[in-house]
Protein backbone atom coordinates (compact mmCIF):
# COMPACT_ATOMS: atom_id res chain seq x y z
CA UNK A 1 0.00 0.00 0.00
CA UNK A 2 1.31 3.42 -0.89
CA UNK A 3 2.21 5.29 2.30
CA UNK A 4 0.26 8.48 2.71
CA UNK A 5 1.84 11.63 4.09
CA UNK A 6 -0.09 13.54 6.73
CA UNK A 7 -0.16 17.30 6.44
CA UNK A 8 0.98 19.17 9.55
CA UNK A 9 -0.41 22.51 10.67
CA UNK A 10 0.36 24.54 13.79
CA UNK A 11 -2.74 25.71 15.68
CA UNK A 12 -2.86 28.32 18.46
CA UNK A 13 -5.99 28.52 20.61
CA UNK A 14 -6.35 30.37 23.92
CA UNK A 15 -2.58 30.85 23.99
CA UNK A 16 -2.05 27.08 23.71
CA UNK A 17 -0.23 25.82 20.63
CA UNK A 18 -0.56 22.33 19.23
CA UNK A 19 -0.06 20.45 15.97
CA UNK A 20 -2.83 19.23 13.68
CA UNK A 21 -2.29 16.19 11.44
CA UNK A 22 -4.66 15.56 8.56
CA UNK A 23 -4.87 13.87 5.18
CA UNK A 24 -3.99 15.93 2.13
CA UNK A 25 -7.11 17.25 0.41
CA UNK A 26 -6.44 15.22 -2.74
CA UNK A 27 -6.22 11.88 -0.89
CA UNK A 28 -9.11 9.43 -1.12
CA UNK A 29 -10.61 9.33 2.36
CA UNK A 30 -12.79 6.28 1.72
CA UNK A 31 -9.76 4.07 1.02
CA UNK A 32 -7.15 5.45 3.42
CA UNK A 33 -5.92 3.09 6.14
CA UNK A 34 -2.47 3.05 7.71
CA UNK A 35 -0.81 0.58 10.06
CA UNK A 36 2.70 1.39 11.27
CA UNK A 37 5.19 0.29 13.89
CA UNK A 38 5.08 2.59 16.92
CA UNK A 39 8.87 2.91 16.91
CA UNK A 40 8.78 4.06 13.28
CA UNK A 41 6.34 6.82 14.24
CA UNK A 42 8.46 7.65 17.29
CA UNK A 43 11.58 8.03 15.13
CA UNK A 44 9.81 10.09 12.44
CA UNK A 45 7.82 12.35 14.76
CA UNK A 46 9.76 12.40 18.04
CA UNK A 47 9.20 16.12 18.60
CA UNK A 48 5.62 15.99 17.32
CA UNK A 49 4.65 13.18 19.71
CA UNK A 50 5.89 15.15 22.71
CA UNK A 51 3.96 18.27 21.73
CA UNK A 52 0.20 18.52 22.16
CA UNK A 53 -1.35 17.43 18.86
CA UNK A 54 -4.42 15.88 17.30
CA UNK A 55 -5.39 13.89 14.22
CA UNK A 56 -8.49 14.46 12.14
CA UNK A 57 -8.62 10.67 12.01
CA UNK A 58 -9.56 7.74 14.20
CA UNK A 59 -6.47 6.13 15.70
CA UNK A 60 -5.56 3.05 17.72
CA UNK A 61 -2.27 2.68 19.60
CA UNK A 62 -1.44 -0.82 20.84
CA UNK A 63 1.66 -0.99 23.05
CA UNK A 64 3.03 -4.54 23.12
CA UNK A 65 5.63 -3.48 25.68
CA UNK A 66 7.35 -0.48 27.23
CA UNK A 67 6.25 2.32 29.48
CA UNK A 68 5.47 6.01 29.47
CA UNK A 69 2.62 8.48 29.83
CA UNK A 70 -0.16 9.18 27.34
CA UNK A 71 -1.89 12.54 27.78
CA UNK A 72 -5.40 12.76 26.31
CA UNK A 73 -7.40 15.98 26.63
CA UNK A 74 -4.98 17.01 29.42
CA UNK A 75 -5.59 13.87 31.52
CA UNK A 76 -2.72 11.42 32.03
CA UNK A 77 -2.85 7.68 31.37
CA UNK A 78 -0.16 5.13 32.12
CA UNK A 79 1.34 3.15 29.25
CA UNK A 80 2.18 -0.46 30.12
CA UNK A 81 2.47 -3.87 28.51
CA UNK A 82 -0.58 -4.60 26.37
CA UNK A 83 -2.20 -1.17 26.72
CA UNK A 84 -4.46 -0.17 23.82
CA UNK A 85 -5.77 3.38 23.34
CA UNK A 86 -8.73 4.22 21.09
CA UNK A 87 -8.93 7.84 19.95
CA UNK A 88 -11.68 9.55 18.00
CA UNK A 89 -10.79 12.48 15.72
CA UNK A 90 -9.60 15.73 17.28
CA UNK A 91 -8.71 14.29 20.68
CA UNK A 92 -5.75 16.36 21.89
CA UNK A 93 -2.91 14.11 22.96
CA UNK A 94 0.82 13.92 23.68
CA UNK A 95 3.33 11.34 24.90
CA UNK A 96 5.88 11.66 27.69
CA UNK A 97 8.83 9.55 28.83
CA UNK A 98 8.40 6.74 26.29
CA UNK A 99 10.83 3.96 27.21
CA UNK A 100 11.47 0.67 25.37
CA UNK A 101 8.10 0.85 23.62
CA UNK A 102 7.06 -1.61 20.94
CA UNK A 103 3.72 -2.01 19.21
CA UNK A 104 1.54 -0.83 16.35
CA UNK A 105 -0.54 2.22 15.49
CA UNK A 106 -3.45 2.42 13.05
CA UNK A 107 -5.31 5.42 11.71
CA UNK A 108 -8.23 5.88 9.34
CA UNK A 109 -10.88 8.51 8.52
CA UNK A 110 -14.61 8.50 9.29
CA UNK A 111 -15.40 7.50 5.71
CA UNK A 112 -13.38 4.29 6.11
CA UNK A 113 -15.67 3.14 8.94
CA UNK A 114 -18.62 3.25 6.54
CA UNK A 115 -17.23 0.08 4.95
CA UNK A 116 -17.94 -1.82 8.18
CA UNK A 117 -21.34 -3.42 8.85
CA UNK A 118 -23.72 -0.84 10.36
CA UNK A 119 -24.52 -2.79 13.53
CA UNK A 120 -20.87 -3.58 14.20
CA UNK A 121 -19.88 -0.02 13.33
CA UNK A 122 -22.26 1.26 16.01
CA UNK A 123 -20.86 -1.15 18.57
CA UNK A 124 -17.28 -0.17 17.76
CA UNK A 125 -18.01 3.55 18.02
CA UNK A 126 -19.92 3.22 21.29
CA UNK A 127 -17.45 0.88 22.98
CA UNK A 128 -14.17 2.21 21.69
CA UNK A 129 -14.37 5.73 20.31
CA UNK A 130 -17.35 7.44 21.97
CA UNK A 131 -17.90 5.65 25.32
CA UNK A 132 -19.99 7.15 28.13
CA UNK A 133 -16.88 8.01 30.15
CA UNK A 134 -15.36 9.93 27.24
CA UNK A 135 -12.21 7.89 26.56
CA UNK A 136 -11.57 4.15 26.18
CA UNK A 137 -8.53 1.99 26.64
CA UNK A 138 -8.00 -1.64 27.55
CA UNK A 139 -5.33 -4.24 28.26
CA UNK A 140 -4.55 -7.13 25.93
CA UNK A 141 -2.95 -10.13 27.62
CA UNK A 142 -0.11 -12.06 26.00
CA UNK A 143 -2.45 -14.99 25.35
CA UNK A 144 -4.99 -12.72 23.63
CA UNK A 145 -2.22 -11.01 21.67
CA UNK A 146 -1.09 -14.37 20.26
CA UNK A 147 -4.62 -15.01 18.99
CA UNK A 148 -4.73 -11.59 17.27
CA UNK A 149 -1.22 -11.68 15.76
CA UNK A 150 -2.31 -13.47 12.54
CA UNK A 151 -4.79 -10.66 11.81
CA UNK A 152 -2.16 -7.98 12.46
CA UNK A 153 0.30 -9.84 10.23
CA UNK A 154 -2.22 -9.90 7.37
CA UNK A 155 -2.76 -6.15 7.79
CA UNK A 156 0.96 -5.46 7.73
CA UNK A 157 1.51 -7.67 4.68
CA UNK A 158 -1.36 -6.01 2.79
CA UNK A 159 -0.03 -2.58 3.73
CA UNK A 160 3.27 -3.36 2.00
CA UNK A 161 1.56 -4.24 -1.30
CA UNK A 162 0.37 -2.03 -4.15
CA UNK A 163 -3.24 -2.56 -5.20
CA UNK A 164 -4.64 -1.23 -8.46
CA UNK A 165 -8.15 -1.46 -7.03
CA UNK A 166 -7.97 0.85 -3.99
CA UNK A 167 -11.61 0.24 -3.13
CA UNK A 168 -11.04 -3.52 -2.95
CA UNK A 169 -7.97 -2.98 -0.79
CA UNK A 170 -9.93 -0.72 1.58
CA UNK A 171 -12.69 -3.33 1.88
CA UNK A 172 -10.07 -5.95 2.75
CA UNK A 173 -8.60 -3.71 5.45
CA UNK A 174 -12.09 -2.98 6.80
CA UNK A 175 -12.76 -6.73 7.11
CA UNK A 176 -9.48 -7.32 8.95
CA UNK A 177 -10.05 -4.31 11.21
CA UNK A 178 -13.52 -5.62 12.06
CA UNK A 179 -12.07 -8.99 13.09
CA UNK A 180 -9.35 -7.35 15.17
CA UNK A 181 -11.71 -5.00 17.01
CA UNK A 182 -14.21 -7.80 17.69
CA UNK A 183 -11.38 -9.78 19.30
CA UNK A 184 -10.32 -6.75 21.33
CA UNK A 185 -13.88 -6.33 22.60
CA UNK A 186 -14.11 -10.06 23.43
CA UNK A 187 -10.63 -10.67 24.82
CA UNK A 188 -9.55 -7.27 26.13
CA UNK A 189 -9.48 -6.53 29.85
CA UNK A 190 -11.90 -3.61 30.01
CA UNK A 191 -13.66 -3.60 33.38
CA UNK A 192 -13.57 -0.03 34.69
CA UNK A 193 -10.02 0.49 33.37
CA UNK A 194 -11.22 3.37 31.24
CA UNK A 195 -11.96 5.24 34.48
CA UNK A 196 -8.57 4.75 36.12
CA UNK A 197 -5.51 6.99 36.14
CA UNK A 198 -7.48 10.11 35.16
CA UNK A 199 -6.09 13.05 37.09
CA UNK A 200 -9.30 15.12 37.14
CA UNK A 201 -11.26 14.80 40.44
CA UNK A 202 -14.52 15.80 38.74
CA UNK A 203 -13.98 13.09 36.14
CA UNK A 204 -13.46 10.48 38.87
CA UNK A 205 -16.74 11.53 40.53
CA UNK A 206 -18.53 11.25 37.19
CA UNK A 207 -16.94 7.85 36.51
CA UNK A 208 -18.09 6.49 39.88
CA UNK A 209 -21.60 7.80 39.24
CA UNK A 210 -21.76 6.04 35.86
CA UNK A 211 -20.49 2.81 37.44
CA UNK A 212 -23.09 3.00 40.24
CA UNK A 213 -25.92 3.53 37.73
CA UNK A 214 -24.76 0.56 35.64
CA UNK A 215 -24.37 -1.70 38.70
CA UNK A 216 -27.81 -0.71 40.03
CA UNK A 217 -29.41 -1.34 36.62
CA UNK A 218 -27.89 -4.82 36.36
CA UNK A 219 -29.00 -5.65 39.92
CA UNK A 220 -32.64 -4.62 39.43
CA UNK A 221 -33.27 -5.57 35.79
CA UNK A 222 -33.19 -9.24 34.91
CA UNK A 223 -32.50 -10.19 31.30
CA UNK A 224 -35.62 -11.56 29.61
CA UNK A 225 -35.81 -13.81 26.53
Give a label for each model feature:
Residues 59, 147-154, 176, 180-183:
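Amphipathic, well-ordered alpha-helical segments in soluble domains
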Residues 69-71, 87, 93-98, 104:
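Short beta-strand His + acidic residue motifs that chelate non-heme Fe in jelly-roll/DSBH
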Residues 41, 65-67, 90-92, 110-114:
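Short, charged/polar surface micro-motifs in flexible loops or helix N-caps
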Residues 2-11, 16-27, 97-163, 190:
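A hydrophobic/aromatic-rich effector-binding and dimerization subdomain
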Residues 142, 162-172, 184-224:
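Short, Lys/Arg-enriched, Trp-marked, Pro/Gly-tolerant hinge/linker segments that flank
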Residues 74-88:
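Short acidic-glycine-tyrosine-enriched beta hairpin
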Residues 1-71, 75-77:
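Generic protein-terminus/edge-of-domain signal
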Amino acid sequence: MEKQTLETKKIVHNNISYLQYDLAKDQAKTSFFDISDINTIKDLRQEGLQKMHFLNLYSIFWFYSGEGTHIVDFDEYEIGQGTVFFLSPKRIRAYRNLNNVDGIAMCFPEDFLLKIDNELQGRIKTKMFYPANGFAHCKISEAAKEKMKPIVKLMQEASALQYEDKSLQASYFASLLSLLLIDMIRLGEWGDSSFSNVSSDSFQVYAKFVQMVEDNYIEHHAVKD
